[in-house]
Regions:
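C-terminal capping/lid region of NAD(P)-dependent oxidoreductase domains
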Residues: 150, 211, 286-290, 301-322
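NAD(P)H dinucleotide-binding glycine-rich loop of Rossmann-like/cofactor-binding domains
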Residues: 76-154
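N-terminal Rossmann-like NAD(P) cofactor-binding module of classical short-chain dehydrogenase/reductase
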Residues: 72, 215-218
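Short amphipathic alpha-helix with an adjacent loop that forms part of the alpha/beta core around
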Residues: 202-212
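Glycine-rich phosphate-binding loop and adjacent beta-alpha segment
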Residues: 90, 170-172, 178-181, 221-290, ...
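Short, surface-exposed secondary-structure boundary micro-motifs
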Residues: 33-34, 76, 110, 244, ...
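Mid-domain Rossmann-like dinucleotide-binding core that forms the NAD(H)/NADP(H) cofactor-binding site
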Residues: 68, 122-200
Length: 322
């Protein structure tokens, strides 16, 4: 089969023929039609995870066929039986085991789910990792409630967009942030109430003046600007962190947290229950993933460059065997 191989970190990905995967007990092989990219794949290419052993086939998201049926795969393996957190055996498709950027991939049989009927395969390939992460952050951890006001940071990325779509479906009042005015306007066209440019000095003061405080924040950046998120929170608000692309949180005033009874919660990926509930939400509200661009398989490096640029609005998808 053909697979996209990372042979060393920070080197061009090459497409080569490798042996078909051989499933072990309780595993099956899925024929991949489309695969979706995530920032995780870029970070693996750059060697930013511990214990990476090259050569490597990355990719956590896919839509394909199994026994002639259209399927997608929950990329969160071995979560365990406790809903509050993952087990010590938890892993994500695409590291350390070979992932979705190949014509075939072996996965646990229990991870296979039917492709939602209203979705095309390329849309299905956009959904699993980002949709699961967004669902858990917004609903399982954030406990989003209809009528609440939510700020979703970094709009344009896959998780942020799914969080926005899910929040809108549930009847929340959605606000977004970005450093790109075009992305803000696109989000507003999709239903967001308004957006702010976090590069603007004292944006948080303007936000509260114009829109009031928020009850919930969904953030994947952290970093030096995190303290401003606290400042726009209403009493008893929740801030859910699902990523840390901007690094350490260094400017945080404890009194602003405990006096307003604010909860700061961590969230990553999700359980099998989260995944099933996410699919139910997507099907009930006929939600379609936002796709930025679909690349042919032989343009895998161009797809990674697009992801690295940060210019995308929505998911980047590869046509493996469309």
């Amino acid at each position: 089969m053909k697979a996209a191989i990372i042979k060393e970190k920070n080197t061009p990905i090459v497409i080569e023929q490798i042996a078909n995967p051989e499933p072990s007990l309780k595993e099956v092989v899925v024929d991949v039609q489309f695969a979706g990219l995530n920032h995780r794949d870029v970070w693996i290419l750059k060697g930013q995870y511990a214990g990476i052993q090259y050569p490597m086939v990355v990719g956590s998201d896919l839509a394909g066929t199994y026994l002639g049926k259209k399927v997608i795969v929950n990329p969160a393996f071995n979560w365990g039986n406790i809903q509050t957190h993952q087990s010590n055996h938890f892993e994500i498709l695409g590291l350390p085991k070979y992932g979705a950027l190949a014509e075939k991939v072996k996965v646990p049989e229990s991870s296979i789910h039917p492709l939602p009927e209203h979705l095309k395969p390329e849309e299905g390939a956009s959904l699993p990792l980002a949709g699961l992460t967004a669902y858990r952050a917004l609903i399982s951890r954030g406990q989003a409630v209809k009528g609440e006001k939510v700020l979703i940071t970094g709009i344009g990325g896959g998780v942020a967009l799914f969080a926005m779509q899910f929040a809108l479906a549930l009847g929340l009042e959605v606000y977004v942030s970005s450093s790109d005015e075009n992305k803000i306007q696109k989000a507003v066209s999709l239903g967001a109430k308004a957006g702010v440019n976090y590069k603007n000095e004292e944006w948080e003061k303007d936000f509260v003046k114009n829109f009031g405080g928020v009850d919930l924040v969904i953030d994947g950046a952290a970093g030096d600007g995190f303290g401003k998120l606290v400042k726009i929170c209403n009493p008893a608000a929740r801030i859910v962190i699902y990523g840390g692309t901007n690094g350490m949180i260094t400017q945080l005033i404890p009194q602003q947290i405990f006096w307003k009874q604010i909860s700061i919660l961590g969230s990553t990926m999700g359980s099998e229950t989260d995944f099933k509930n996410m699919l139910t939400l997507v099907e009930k509200h006929q939600i379609h993933p936002v796709i930025d661009q679909i690349f042919p398989f032989d343009e895998v490096n161009e797809a990674f460059n697009r992801m690295s640029s940060g210019k995308q609005f929505g998911k980047i998808v590869l046509g493996i065997a469309p």
